[in-house]
């Protein structure tokens, strides 16, 4: 029986609907009000009534308004044309919305996610008679700098034989590309695009692997001390203004991935505007073209309805999984998952559910875990590899890492990059605290060496705390030297100048080279007559290494600075291993 319904109650963006007929959980409905149709999602079903969260402002909705049931889940359209686009959480292209509406977007306006008029040059790789299943490739089109594979839709459950496939040429996303037939004789027309529900993971692959290969970000403190693996997960918690968004932008520019997807879910409008303005101007170091050519942005600012924040996170991860199915490496950056969790808390309160810690819903941990678990590296049907790496920033109030969202995130991620107010106020970038952060993945530098360096940083911090109480004169020369060496490692290796063309991105070879040099200095034993002499010597080393950081690797100036550094160290200690 076809469902019929009317509005019987409205609380904020939660609408209660009286229903006659059969409905399903997470079904999309349209509320007819004032000549508009507002999209909503059913989130609770009770006897004769359902509750739906509306993705728009609910002003004007009245008791008795009619409901249109779609019998479909919230889906995204997948196909050529997703890259370089800016979408809202419901996959409406924002530039086209702005062209139609001006500065203030209208309610109830939903546009096609993909350009239906643009023609793509299709190159067939399959042929008539081939046996295919969901996720298999029929051919490809060139989208920006990547080969966008045209696939059998993921919802096809049978094995099919190709009975017809078009020749190479230009086609729109709605044109027939192929006709496939199953064993029962049922034929299906395949086009370049199809829809997929955002809350259901795409699982059309042979095998899921354990992430092991490092995803090189070219940020020293991450790659060396707290690495992220391709197909892994990481989080960047930190107080407001600590540099989370900037660190994510630097990562997206330099990371060793094919495609970057940014989900700005609930960030302040000013930060989202900054991202939208900066990204088209950024040059991709790999291609020399605009970074936007391999980027897709899904944005819902904190001023937009809360329900759309949740949608934007799921839309982004689904698009990431789609490109993973082509054998590509994807990086998804969610900024910020705290605002998504706050949206869940708001909706949970309206549903009158029993609250958990700090009024967050009791199911907060399982929802966050289900999102991060969609990351991973997989073996596809043709034997190639694809990965989705997920990084979420968390904005705990006051930088308190003990709050529920941070704790729920820490239980499921593989790396933790904790930013602190103390380091950001000291103008240290990245402001990642080397003593609180951790990673379960393998980095670009040998693990034993990095552990030795971290122990050195911990000792240096202990001595620094002691000096705040007893002063420099209250500690031995040996302890003071340990403190100076830890500061040398911090300033010359853990910090980076993102505005310098050389120091902004450091490849693994250079990271290993510079770390070995510093590692030898940490292990060397120096003798000084006074603390003043020790400080002067370490300051000379620091300036020399900082100059090397700003100089292109292995060029003449770099080599001269290296010789100068070795001579300086040799003057105080003969067994310097870099000599």
UniProtKB/Swiss-Prot annotation:
Binding locations of ATP: 238-245
Protein's UniProt keywords contain DNA-binding: no
Molecular functions (GO terms): ATP binding; proton-transporting ATP synthase activity, rotational mechanism; proton-transporting ATPase activity, rotational mechanism
Keywords attached to this entry: ATP synthesis, ATP-binding, Hydrogen ion transport, Ion transport, Nucleotide-binding, Translocase, Transport
UniProt-listed Enzyme Commission number(s): 7.1.2.2
UniProt cross-references to Pfam families, sorted A to Z: ATP-synt_ab, ATP-synt_ab_N, ATP-synt_ab_Xtn, ATP-synt_VA_C
Entries under Gene3D superfamilies matching the protein: 2.40.30.20, 2.40.50.100, Bovine Mitochondrial F1-atpase, Atp Synthase Beta Chain, Chain D, domain 3, P-loop containing nucleotide triphosphate hydrolases
GO process annotations (BP): proton motive force-driven plasma membrane ATP synthesis
InterPro entries reported in the protein's UniProt record: ATP-synt_VA_C, ATP-synth_a_Xtn, ATP_synth_asu-like_sf, ATPase_a/bsu_AS, ATPase_F1/V1/A1_a/bsu_N, ATPase_F1/V1/A1_a/bsu_nucl-bd, ATPase_F1/V1_b/a_C, P-loop_NTPase
Class of the enzyme per the UniProt entry, highest EC level: translocase
Annotated function: Produces ATP from ADP in the presence of a proton gradient across the membrane. The V-type alpha chain is a catalytic subunit.
Family: Belongs to the ATPase alpha/beta chains family.
Identification of the protein by name: V-type ATP synthase alpha chain
Organism (species): Borrelia hermsii (strain HS1 / DAH)
Gene that encodes it: atpA
């Amino acid at each position: 029986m076809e469902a019929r319904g009317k509005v019987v109650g409205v609380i904020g963006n939660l609408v209660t609907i009286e229903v006659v007929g059969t409905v399903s959980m997470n079904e999309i409905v349209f509320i007819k009000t004032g000549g508009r149709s507002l999209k909503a999602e059913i989130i609770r079903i009770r006897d004769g009534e359902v509750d739906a969260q509306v993705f728009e402002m609910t002003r004007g909705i009245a008791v008795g308004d009619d409901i249109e049931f779609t019998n479909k889940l919230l889906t995204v359209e997948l196909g050529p044309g997703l890259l370089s686009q800016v979408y809202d959480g419901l996959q409406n292209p924002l530039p086209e919305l702005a062209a139609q509406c001006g500065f203030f977007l209208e309610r109830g306006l939903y546009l096609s996610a993909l350009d239906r008029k643009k023609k793509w040059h299709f190159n067939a790789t399959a042929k008539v008679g081939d046996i295919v299943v969901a996720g298999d490739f029929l051919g490809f089109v060139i989208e920006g700098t990547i080969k966008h594979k045209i696939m059998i839709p993921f919802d096809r459950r049978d094995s099919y034989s190709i009975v017809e496939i078009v020749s190479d040429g230009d086609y729109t996303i709605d044109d027939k590309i192929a006709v496939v037939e199953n064993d029962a004789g049922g034929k299906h027309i395949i086009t370049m695009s199809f829809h997929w529900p955002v809350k259901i993971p795409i699982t059309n692959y042979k095998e899921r692997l354990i992430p092991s290969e490092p995803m090189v970000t070219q940020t020293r403190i991450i790659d060396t001390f707290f690495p992220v693996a391709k197909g892994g997960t990481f989080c960047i918690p930190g107080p407001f203004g600590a540099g989370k968004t900037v660190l994510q932008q630097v990562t997206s520019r330099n990371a060793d991935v094919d495609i970057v997807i940014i989900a700005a879910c609930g960030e302040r409008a000013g930060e989202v505007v900054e991202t939208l303005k900066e990204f088209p101007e950024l040059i991709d170091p790999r291609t020399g073209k605009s970074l936007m050519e391999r980027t897709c942005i899904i944005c819902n600012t904190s001023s937009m309805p809360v329900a759309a924040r949740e949608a934007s996170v799921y839309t982004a991860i689904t698009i990431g999984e789609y490109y993973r199915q082509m054998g590509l490496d994807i990086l998804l950056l969610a900024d910020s998952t705290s605002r998504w969790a706050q949206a869940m808390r708001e909706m949970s309160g309206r549903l009158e559910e029993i609250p958990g810690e700090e009024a967050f819903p009791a199911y907060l941990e399982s929802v966050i875990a289900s999102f991060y678990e969609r990351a991973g590296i997989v073996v596809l049907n043709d034997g190639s590899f694809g990965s989705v790496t997920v990084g979420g920033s968390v904005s705990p109030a006051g930088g308190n890492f003990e709050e529920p969202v941070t704790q729920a995130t820490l239980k499921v991620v593989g790396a933790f990059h904790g930013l602190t107010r103390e380091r950001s106020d000291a103008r240290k970038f990245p402001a990642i605290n080397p003593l609180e952060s951790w990673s379960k993945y393998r980095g670009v530098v040998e693990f034993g060496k990095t552990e030795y360096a971290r122990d050195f940083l911990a000792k240096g911090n202990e001595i620094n705390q002691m000096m705040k109480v007893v002063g420099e004169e209250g500690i031995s020369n040996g302890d003071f030297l340990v403190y100076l060496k830890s500061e040398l490692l911090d300033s010359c290796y853990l910090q980076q100048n993102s505005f310098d063309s050389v120091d902004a991105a450091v490849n693994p070879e250079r990271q290993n080279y510079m770390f070995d040099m510093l590692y030898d200095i940490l292990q060397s034993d120096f003798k000084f007559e006074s603390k003043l002499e020790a400080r002067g010597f370490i300051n000379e080393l620091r300036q020399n290494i900082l100059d090397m950081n700003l100089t292109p690797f292995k060029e003449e100036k770099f080599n001269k600075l290296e010789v100068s550094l070795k001579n300086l160290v040799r003057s105080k200690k003969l067994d310097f291993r870099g000599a």
